[in-house]
Regions:
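Multi-pass membrane proteins that catalyze or facilitate reactions on polyprenyl-/lipid-phosphate substrates
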Residues: 1-277
């Protein structure tokens, strides 16, 4: 793998992980579009690179959200130390809600690994998911924000639903942030609050998936430079994606992302149908 390819894929992963456009879908489409075959048939090496990019993205996003992460960890730990004799309130309740969202996502992830191992490799399905979930994102985001709820206003059953929705993103093209933003907006969560919720929900899932996959990863000596460069590119672009989306949603909606998904999906299907790629 060239350093240029590593930089491009790192930037693509970091930017699209938190924008509602599907990072896994883009990581399949970009090499397919340009005819890159950096890994050949070595699926284990490709998965190792994917883990590196996700861990880079995790570092960038965690750094950006560090005050929120520390705040909710402290609140949750304080509630646990108090003996959990009373129902959590405020930040402690939000911390518990975030923890609950990770459970169904983790269970679905383990089921995917145990039954199929990998849901990628079908470009037509990635394109279809981009279109379908792009339309759903547009529909969900049309909700009026004047009665918007905060994270703390969600119920624990809402948290389970959000976690299940996040689990759908194991299929490339769905988008973890896109599907959870759609559900959060359907649950009447205010737009910027929904984005912050989605980012915080994703951190333990990305970390858990990365650690689980890292246990089975072996990186050949000659591959360390592109792995490190890709990870750094993903960290920087992941930080930037969180920053840009939060600023953007303070002023406008998600319609532009929905339109991009639909156009990209139909573009890929057209290339497939005409035999260009």
């Amino acid at each position: 793998m060239s350093i240029l390819h590593a930089i491009v894929l790192g930037l693509v992963q970091g930017l699209t992980e938190f924008l509602p456009v599907s990072s896994s879908g883009h990581l399949e489409i970009v090499p397919w579009l340009f005819g890159w075959e950096d890994f050949g048939s070595d699926v284990r090496l490709e998965n190792a690179f994917d883990v590196a990019l996700h861990l880079g993205t995790l570092m960038g996003a965690t750094y950006y959200l560090r005050s929120d992460v520390v705040r909710y960890l402290r609140a949750g730990w304080g509630w646990l130390r108090s003996g959990v004799g009373t129902a959590p309130t405020g930040d402690a309740r939000t911390s518990c809600l975030l923890a609950v969202t990770a459970v169904p996502t983790g269970i679905l992830g383990l089921l995917v690994v145990a039954t199929t191992g990998d849901l990628g490799g079908r470009t037509w399905l990635v394109a279809t998911c981009l279109i379908v979930f792009g339309v759903l994102l547009w529909i969900a985001d049309r909700r009026d924000d004047r009665d918007g709820r905060g994270m703390v206003d969600l119920s624990f059953s809402n948290a389970v639903v959000l976690g299940l929705a996040q689990g759908l993103a194991f299929q490339p093209g769905v988008s973890r942030s896109g599907v959870t933003l759609s559900v959060a907006r359907t649950l009447r969560v205010e737009r910027t609050e929904a984005a912050r919720l989605v980012f915080l929900m994703s951190l333990p899932v990305i970390a858990g998936a990365g650690l689980l996959s890292a246990a089975d990863v072996t990186v050949p000596a000659g591959w360390w430079p592109p792995f490190i460069v890709g990870m750094v590119a993903a960290a920087v672009s992941g930080w930037l994606a969180v920053h840009l989306l939060l600023r953007l949603l303070a002023r406008t909606g998600l319609g532009g992302f929905a339109a991009y998904r639909v156009v990209l999906g139909f573009g890929v299907l057209t290339l497939l149908a005409t035999g260009v790629r």
